């Protein structure tokens, strides 16, 4: 049982430190994307045959089945 507690604490510490690393990166000025890399913000920007899954354009079969 002590081993499980140790690993749980270790995982929490890793996630906690990762949170601050991510925040620091988000607060820093991020590099701009090249002109050919356009951020997809809505399903209307998806190419034909792809659908919006909330994050990016994917094949409808990639996330329709659970």
UniProtKB/Swiss-Prot annotation:
Disulfide links within the chain: 46-57
InterPro entries, sorted: Chitin-bd_dom_sf
Residues making up the signal peptide according to the UniProt record: 1-26
GO cellular component, one term: extracellular region
Keyword annotations: Antibiotic, Antimicrobial, Chitin-binding, Disulfide bond, Fungicide, Secreted, Signal
One of the GO BP terms on file: defense response to Gram-negative bacterium
Main location: secreted
Keyword Zinc-finger found: no
Gene Ontology MF terms: chitin binding
Location in or out of the cell: Secreted
Record's function text: Possesses antifungal activity against phytopathogenic fungi such as P.oryzae, R.solani and B.cinerea but not against phytopathogenic bacteria. Shows weak activity against the insect pathogenic fungus B.bassiana and against S.aureus. Binds chitin.
Name the UniProt record assigns to this protein: Scarabaecin
Species in which this protein is naturally found: Oryctes rhinoceros (Coconut rhinoceros beetle)
